[in-house]
């Protein structure tokens, strides 16, 4: 008799995705982040669900409802801080996952890569709207500044912004709709993640060497299930260290001040994971130009596969490209630092140089270096 695991329509899908899935024998810990992102998403949905049971999306009570969750709800404080810091863990895993894709040439799976970019945009939108919900100073002014960027769109901009706001400023209508979208988007993200996996399993995983591994596959279970569990333990350990020892380390103190439309904070800045994009936005003195640069800073990932000029898929055996990749990482860290600094000399100049370098590396230097490396193979 055949095992029900392999015959039942539901278990068959799980079996082919997580148990009997043929996986390359040499994938490293950099391949753990897909499963870690899945765990992050589950943590965020569960903690978010329990927070939504006690949260009120009304400007008069939103701030005090969050306070109520932390003070009066059983273990409300831990749920709230797991949700807030879970977002940070989510983005750490996301950036490492995308970085892995860039380094090892995983972007050659174009469907998987493109859905990944859509997922990145969806997660960023969700995180932005979630940051507005506690209705602190940074929530209110962050929402005002970022939504206002849409007014740079010619002709329809102003109408579009007022339509999103549901009025002439960020107010009760904005908060209510942001809560609705923040609640529904993670489920859309879950569906997209399933499609992301579907496309990945059409081709099978890439591996560090970038060489096809069809001749050397091992079953996902037990080899990679145990490896993923180890990664998950590290993730949960890091998250709980953050939550239990310094829950406000990555937050902004201004968000403990209730939203006040009459008082602008001295430095409006988003959460740390958006600072690199915020720095790129601010580095261009023109409003529309800044908005385009902001969108393109993520959208540039979509044209990476078209700019792949190397004869090798992975960077494993390409030392010059490796140097350029780590320069890109350093540049992104610089942008993240600049995004959190005030708009004054020398930060403006550093931000502009770092922004130019970011696009230069991805669009110009990477393809050129790859061609040089191709020629070096003939030496």
From Swiss-Prot:
Cofactor: heme b
Binding site for heme b b566: 97, 196
Name of the gene: MT-CYB
Transmembrane segments: 33-53, 77-98, 113-133, 178-198, 226-246, 288-308, 320-340, 347-367
Recorded GO MF terms: metal ion binding; ubiquinol-cytochrome-c reductase activity
Assembly: The cytochrome bc1 complex contains 11 subunits: 3 respiratory subunits (MT-CYB, CYC1 and UQCRFS1), 2 core proteins (UQCRC1 and UQCRC2) and 6 low-molecular weight proteins (UQCRH/QCR6, UQCRB/QCR7, UQCRQ/QCR8, UQCR10/QCR9, UQCR11/QCR10 and a cleavage product of UQCRFS1). This cytochrome bc1 complex then forms a dimer.
Alphabetically ordered keywords of this record: Electron transport, Heme, Iron, Membrane, Metal-binding, Mitochondrion, Mitochondrion inner membrane, Respiratory chain, Transmembrane, Transmembrane helix, Transport, Ubiquinone
Name of the protein in question: Cytochrome b
Gene3D superfamilies given in the database record: Cytochrome Bc1 Complex, Chain C
Residues binding a ubiquinone, per UniProt: 201
GO biological process: mitochondrial electron transport, ubiquinol to cytochrome c
Stored PANTHER family: CYTOCHROME B
Record-linked InterPro entries: Cyt_b/b6_C, Cyt_b/b6_C_sf, Cyt_b/b6_N, Cytb/b6-like_sf, Cytochrome_b, Cytochrome_b_C_euk/bac, Cytochrome_b_N_euk/bac, Di-haem_cyt_TM
CDD domains in UniProt: cytochrome_b_C, Cytochrome_b_N
Any single GO CC term annotated in Swiss-Prot or TrEMBL for this entry: respiratory chain complex III
Family as reported in the entry's similarity comment: Belongs to the cytochrome b family.
Function: Component of the ubiquinol-cytochrome c reductase complex (complex III or cytochrome b-c1 complex) that is part of the mitochondrial respiratory chain. The b-c1 complex mediates electron transfer from ubiquinol to cytochrome c. Contributes to the generation of a proton gradient across the mitochondrial membrane that is then used for ATP synthesis.
SUPFAM superfamilies the record matches: a domain/subunit of cytochrome bc1 complex (Ubiquinol-cytochrome c reductase) (SSF81648), Transmembrane di-heme cytochromes (SSF81342)
Co-factor note (free text): Binds 2 heme b groups non-covalently.
Location of this chain's protein in the cell: Mitochondrion inner membrane
Annotated membrane topology: Multi-pass membrane protein
């Amino acid at each position: 008799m055949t095992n029900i695991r392999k015959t039942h329509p539901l278990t068959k899908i799980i079996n082919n995705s997580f148990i009997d899935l043929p996986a390359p024998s040499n994938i490293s810990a950099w391949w753990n982040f897909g499963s870690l992102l899945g765990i992050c998403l589950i943590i965020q949905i569960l903690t978010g669900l329990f927070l939504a049971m006690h949260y009120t999306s009304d400007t008069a009570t939103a701030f005090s409802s969050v306070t109520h969750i932390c003070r009066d709800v059983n273990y409300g404080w831990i749920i709230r801080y797991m949700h807030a810091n879970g977002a940070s863990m989510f983005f750490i895993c996301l950036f490492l996952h995308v970085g892995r894709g860039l380094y090892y040439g995983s972007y050659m799976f174009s469907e998987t890569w493109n859905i990944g970019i859509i997922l990145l945009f969806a997660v960023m939108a969700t995180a932005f709207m979630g940051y507005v919900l506690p209705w602190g100073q940074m929530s209110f002014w962050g929402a005002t500044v970022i939504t206002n960027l849409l007014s740079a769109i010619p002709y329809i901009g102003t109408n579009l912004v007022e339509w999103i706001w549901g009025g002439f400023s960020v107010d009760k209508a904005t908060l209510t709709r942001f809560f609705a979208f923040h609640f529904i988007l993670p489920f859309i993200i879950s569906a997209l993640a399933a499609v992301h996996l579907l496309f990945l399993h059409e081709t099978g995983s890439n591996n560090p060497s970038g060489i096809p591994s069809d001749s050397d596959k091992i079953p996902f279970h037990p080899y990679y299930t145990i490896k993923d569990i180890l990664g998950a333990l590290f993730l949960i350990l890091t998250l709980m260290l953050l939550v239990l020892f310094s829950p406000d380390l990555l937050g902004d103190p201004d968000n403990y001040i209730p939203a006040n439309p009459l008082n602008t904070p001295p430095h409006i800045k988003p959460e740390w994971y958006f600072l690199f994009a915020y720095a790129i936005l601010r580095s261009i003195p023109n409003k529309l130009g800044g908005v385009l640069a902001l969108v393109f800073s993520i959208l540039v990932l979509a044209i990476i596969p078209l700019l792949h000029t190397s004869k090798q898929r992975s960077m494993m055996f390409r030392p010059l490209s490796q140097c350029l990749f780590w320069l890109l990482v350093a540049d992104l860290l610089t942008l993240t630092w600049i995004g959190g600094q005030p708009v004054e000399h020398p930060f403006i100049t550093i931000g502009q140089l770092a922004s130019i370098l970011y696009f230069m590396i991805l669009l110009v230097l990477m393809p050129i270096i790859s061609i040089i490396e191709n020629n070096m193979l003939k030496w």
